[in-house]
Amino acid sequence: MVLFIILAILVVILIAIGVLFYMRSNKRNLIEKTEERKNEIEQLPLDDNLRKLTGLNLKGETKTKYDAMKKDNTETTNKYLAPVEEKIQNAEELLEKFKFTAAQTEIDDAHELMDQYEENYQHQVTQVDDIINLHKENEALYEKCKVDYREMKRDVLANRHQFGEAAEPLENEIENYEPKLNEYENLKSEGNYVQAHNHIAALEDQIKNLKSYMDEIPELIRETQKELPGQFQDLKYGCRDLKVEGYDLDHVKVDGTIQSLKTELSFVEPMISRLELDEANNKLENINDKLDEMYDLIEYEVKAKNEVEETKDIITDDLFKAKDMNYTLQTEIEYVRENYYINESDAQSVRQFENEIQSLISVYDDILKETSKSAVRYSEVQDNLQYLEDHVSVINKEQDKLQNHLIQLREDEAEAEDNLLRVQSKKEEVYRRLLASNLTSVPERFIIMKNEIDNEVREVNEQFRERPIHVKQLKDKVAKIVIQMNTFEDEANDVLVNAVYAEKLIQYGNRYRKDHHHVDKSLNEAERLFKNNRYKRAIEIAEEALESVEPGITKHIEEQVIKE
């Protein structure tokens, strides 16, 4: 037994030793990979990358930057790469002692150092590339500025006439660029690449702005010397022609405004010669705005004349229509008021319209006289005609409404008479149905309702014979009688249906009298109520009795009555 225990312990020990050696083997692989990475990092061309700057002019800012980066290289190597070998050796020694955790810590530290080394290397690559690219950009801008400088100089020399008095200031500005180009060369030769970049970039912007000025100046000069003076002349002679045609353009003040604009225009060329183009553009914009205002006023007058010619015919027709309609209304009112009641306000409105129409005709005659003058301000004429058109339109609408009212009086009277005849006919028809029904007698309330309708009809007929008729009152009374008639008919129909239904229920219930005492008793009561014209109560008692012996039968009987 002891032997087995000893053997088991030995097996466990052997397994533990095997595991330890296996773990050490894995860690040794990690150390080998760390060693391989160190070798790869040592191959990074840190110094070779920095040597790219030696092709530049190593002075000034470039030299300072180069020295700083070279110093950083040394510090990076000493601080991050040199300790890596020591970390790897420490890890190997700890691994031999089976101190796996401590060995792993050394390996991790080694990787962190190499990560930082690689990061510094990439940062240096970026810095070197930025410096080289900035030098290239500086050279490209410099070459562009030189080309632009020569072209601008030739352009002013060859096309001096296009620039007018601005040619000399342009030449002076262009000549100022030569020392600035030389200044760039000095900064470059001194190795101050950042200052050189700022200088050449600013110079490129200045040249670009001056080139845009050179493109703009000929256009401004042409507008100042030719286009605007030509527009002044065209506007002046155009207004003279329009005045000959009969336009009153005194309110436009063409001559005075043009003279004022000429004075303003005289300040523009000196501004251009001083290269004050923003101020020159503002001045020209102001001149053009004032020209547009005058053109708008003149165009408004021309359009106003056309509208006046179109509106005159319309207003003439509208005034004639208003006058004719007013005469017709006065005649109709005198005729109609013999038969119908007319509000005095309507008659007064017609007389007021007559005065207004006459006043509008007088105003219209004055306007026509105004248009026959040698000089006419058509915008004012148009405003006056618009007022006339609006006013006469209102009068025509009101007079049309009044005429429709007079026509409606006759139609309303005829409609009221027709409705009254229908009421009389319908009343007699309903009463005949009541008399011919199975009712023991016509209920008293229907006799009362019939008499009330007869009385109302007689009163209305009396009013129809009176003159003048108050149509609205008649129409309202007839409408009230129609409502009474509808109520009379609806209630009569209800009574007739209830009477038939009650009779059917009693007749059907007779079959149960012998065998069901309570049915016989209830039907006797229903018959009594029927004779007293209390049909609804008779129905309730008969329904209750029949439902007690034959459920659902009353519904069936009711449906049959409705169908009949």
Curated annotation (Swiss-Prot):
Lineage top rank: taxon: Bacteria
Chief localization: membrane
Disulfide-linked positions: none
GO biological process: one example: septin ring assembly
Keywords from the named record: Cell cycle, Cell division, Cell membrane, Coiled coil, Membrane, Septation, Transmembrane, Transmembrane helix
Membrane spanning residue stretches: 5-23
Compartments, as annotated in UniProt: Cell membrane
A Pfam family of this chain: EzrA
Coiled coil ranges: 84-126, 165-223, 271-303, 350-435
All ranges on the Extracellular side of the membrane: 1-4
Cytoplasmic-side positions: 24-564
Bilayer disposition of the protein: Single-pass membrane protein
GO terms under cellular component: plasma membrane; septin ring
Its biological purpose: Negative regulator of FtsZ ring formation; modulates the frequency and position of FtsZ ring formation. Inhibits FtsZ ring formation at polar sites. Interacts either with FtsZ or with one of its binding partners to promote depolymerization.
Family named by the database record: Belongs to the EzrA family.
NCBIfam families (UniProt xref): PRK04778.1-6 (NF003412)
HAMAP family, sorted: EzrA
Name of the protein in question: Septation ring formation regulator EzrA
Species assigned in the record: Staphylococcus epidermidis (strain ATCC 12228 / FDA PCI 1200)
